[in-house]
Swiss-Prot record:
Any one GO cellular component localisation term in the record: extracellular space
InterPro entries in alphabetical order: Cystine-knot_cytokine, Glyco_hormone_CN, Gonadotropin_bsu, Gonadotropin_bsu_CS
Organism: Oncorhynchus keta (Chum salmon)
Assembly and binders: Heterodimer of an alpha and a beta chain.
Highest rank taxon of the organism: Eukaryota
Record-given protein name: Gonadotropin subunit beta-1
GO process annotations (BP): G protein-coupled receptor signaling pathway; ovulation
Family: Belongs to the glycoprotein hormones subunit beta family.
Glycosylation sites: N36
Signal peptide: 1-24
Gene: cgba
Disulphide bond pairs: C32-C78, C46-C93, C55-C108, C59-C110, C113-C120
Function: Involved in gametogenesis and steroidogenesis.
Length: 137
């Protein structure tokens, strides 16, 4: 009788271990996805803020501990898969002011970094920057 209860308990625990990662994965998604972002836009005659749809999130990647000339390095980045320009008028602009044309993401994907439209450089400790560790403030 004791062995039967023990086996039943083991089966229940195993079933819970199989279900838990699936459930956690649906609630804890930090992957590449569409995201609304508010940005400040200025021009001489008017200014304001607009909300656009862009891509944000983490991409699974592998970074080797050594550099090799035989293995190409490819960093996956969250970027637009499909996008279009949308015409945006700011509130408070005088009539007749030309609209802004803003790129708006329609879908996102983790893709190889394209240097023609994305900053793909790595941050190195030797690179002068204004990035400050919050713990040092």
């Amino acid at each position: 009788m004791y062995c039967t209860h023990l086996m039943t308990l083991q089966l229940v625990v195993m079933a819970m271990l199989w279900v838990t990662p699936v459930r956690a994965g649906t609630e804890c998604r930090y992957g590449c996805r569409l995201n609304n972002m508010t940005i400040i836009v200025e021009r001489e005659d008017c200014h304001g803020s607009i909300t656009i749809t862009t891509c944000a999130g983490l991409c699974e990647t592998t970074d080797l501990n050594y550099q090799s000339t035989w293995l190409p390095r490819s960093q996956g980045v969250c970027n637009f898969k499909e996008w279009s320009y949308e015409k945006v008028y700011l509130e408070g602009c005088p009539s007749g002011v030309e609209p802004f044309f803003i790129p708006v993401a329609k879908s996102c994907d983790c893709i190889k970094c394209k240097t023609d439209n994305t900053d793909c450089d790595r941050i190195s400790m030797a690179t002068p920057s204004c990035i400050v560790n919050p713990l040092e403030m």
